[in-house]
Structures are given as structure tokens and as C-alpha cells.
């Protein structure tokens, strides 16, 4: 049996706050995401889903517990090791696209690959293939300001997958879009995930979109529970 792409075991996280002093955001969270699986993470605002995603993607460190990415236990690993695994195995998508405004759509997908040591020819070919898969290959030469919100987010998906990660983490990826565009963009995300076979943990307030994923988990009062 293959290893889960992401395994969280006993994750704890507490933040200091003026009042009441400490906020215990995550309380013994356990979660596994299998290869090729799409898992929806639903939670009310402020419940800690962004914190959970940041810990899952090695952008933050839990106070206790273990994070494993593709079988690699990251407990106690230094910044260099964590950065290496994050760059190689994890892709991120946020509510706002965060594309570099001075570069074209194609260049935004090429740049992460160049930073990862991939040759320019190969990087451009992969970028064009990804953009084509989500239907924006005709916009490859446009800068973000010339793209619609839906197009910007599709390019952001492609950038997140540019280095062929094993795990995609998405924080409200359609939250800034109107309902019709949100559905179209989500369809594009599903096409990318299913077409590449990676695993995805996607935080969303949209329960209709969540229901279209393989599994739904809910974060409430710092604890994770399965909905389906």
C-alpha cells in the first residue's frame, strides 16, 4: 500500500493573543491525504484552516505533532531541508492569485521551474501544456492585468503545478470569484488534479464545491472531523 502524500499526526498549535492570552488553534489534529485524492477542508472564518494549510505545506511549524510529506517525516528538520521538500513536493494556491504583474502568464509559470533548475526550453513546454489544459493557452502572452479574474486564477493553478508537486494546498481558491466563474475555475482545478494524479487539500466555504471532492473534513474548535 502506498504512503499517504500528506500525513498529520497529533498537530497542536497555540498563538499568543492580548485577550485571553493564548488561543489554541489546533488540538491534536490527525489527517491523511492519499495519492490522487481531493479533500475539502471546511471551517468557519478564524477556525485555523489557513494555519493548518501552512503547517501542512511546511510554511509553519506545529507546537507538537508530526508532519509527513510523501513518507518524509519533517519533525525537527531544519529550514533548508523544509524548503527543499516544499519546493519539490508542494504547490500552493491562494484566494488572490499573487501573479507577478510585470511578467506574462507564460512567464509566471516558467519562472518557478527555472528557480528549480529546469532548463528554459523544457520549462516553457511544460508551462504551455499546463495553460492549454485549463484553456488559457491563448492568453499566454498577456500580463495579469489584462486577464480576467478567472483567467488569473487558472494561471495561478498552473504556476502551483509547474514543478510537478505531489501535493497541492489551496486556500479558498475560488473565494474571490463570482459563482459562475467559480464553477468554471473549479472545473479547471479538478482537470489539473485528476490529469496529474497529485493529491489536494482545498479549503473552501463553498459547500457545493466541497461536495464534489472525494472527501470533506471540518475544522471546528481546533479539532478535525470527517463529514463524508
Curated annotation (Swiss-Prot):
One cellular component term from this protein's GO annotations in UniProt: plasma membrane
Keywords (A to Z) from UniProt: ATP-binding, Cell inner membrane, Cell membrane, Membrane, Nucleotide-binding, Translocase, Transport
One GO-annotated biological process of the protein: protein localization to outer membrane
Residues given in the record as ATP binding sites: 43-50
Chief location category: membrane
Ranges where the ABC transporter domain occurs: 6-228
EC number: 7.6.2.-
UniProt keyword annotation of Flavoprotein present: no
Pfam families: ABC_tran
Alphabetical list of PROSITE patterns matching this protein: ABC_TRANSPORTER_1, ABC_TRANSPORTER_2, LOLD
Molecular function, one GO term: ATP hydrolysis activity
SUPFAM superfamilies xref list: P-loop containing nucleoside triphosphate hydrolases
CDD domains assigned to the protein according to its UniProt record, in alphabetical order: ABC_MJ0796_LolCDE_FtsE (cd03255)
Cellular localization per UniProt: Cell inner membrane
Highest taxon of the lineage: Bacteria
Membrane topology: Peripheral membrane protein
Subunit architecture: The complex is composed of two ATP-binding proteins (LolD) and two transmembrane proteins (LolC and LolE).
Annotated family: Belongs to the ABC transporter superfamily. Lipoprotein translocase (TC 3.A.1.125) family.
Role played: Part of the ABC transporter complex LolCDE involved in the translocation of mature outer membrane-directed lipoproteins, from the inner membrane to the periplasmic chaperone, LolA. Responsible for the formation of the LolA-lipoprotein complex in an ATP-dependent manner.
Record-given protein name: Lipoprotein-releasing system ATP-binding protein LolD
Species for this entry: Ruegeria pomeroyi (strain ATCC 700808 / DSM 15171 / DSS-3) (Silicibacter pomeroyi)
Amino acid at each position: 500500500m502506498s504512503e499517504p502524500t500528506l500525513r498529520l499526526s497529533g498537530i497542536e498549535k497555540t498563538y499568543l493573543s492580548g485577550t485571553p492570552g493564548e488561543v489554541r488553534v489546533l488540538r491534536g489534529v490527525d489527517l491523511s491525504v492519499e495519492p490522487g485524492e481531493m479533500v475539502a477542508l471546511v471551517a468557519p472564518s478564524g477556525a485555523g484552516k489557513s494555519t493548518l494549510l501552512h503547517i501542512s505545506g511546511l510554511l509553519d511549524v506545529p507546537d507538537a505533532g508530526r508532519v509527513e510529506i510523501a513518507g518524509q517525516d519533517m519533525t525537527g528538520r531544519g529550514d533548508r531541508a523544509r524548503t527543499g521538500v516544499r519546493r519539490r513536493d508542494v504547490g500552493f494556491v491562494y484566494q488572490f492569485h499573487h501573479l507577478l504583474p510585470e511578467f506574462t502568464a507564460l512567464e509566471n509559470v516558467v519562472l518557478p521551474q527555472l528557480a528549480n533548475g529546469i532548463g528554459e526550453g523544457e520549462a516553457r513546454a511544460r508551462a504551455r501544456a499546463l495553460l492549454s489544459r485549463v484553456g488559457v493557452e491563448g492568453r499566454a502572452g498577456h500580463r495579469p492585468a489584462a486577464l480576467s479574474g478567472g483567467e488569473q486564477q487558472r494561471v495561478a493553478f498552473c504556476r502551483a503545478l509547474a514543478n510537478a508537486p505531489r501535493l497541492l494546498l489551496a486556500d479558498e481558491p475560488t473565494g474571490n470569484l463570482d459563482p459562475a466563474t467559480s464553477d468554471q475555475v473549479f472545473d479547471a482545478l479538478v482537470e489539473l488534479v485528476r490529469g496529474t494524479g497529485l493529491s489536494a487539500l482545498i479549503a473552501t466555504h463553498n459547500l457545493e464545491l466541497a461536495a464534489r471532492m472525494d472527501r470533506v473534513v471540518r475544522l471546528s474548535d481546533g479539532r478535525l472531523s470527517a463529514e463524508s
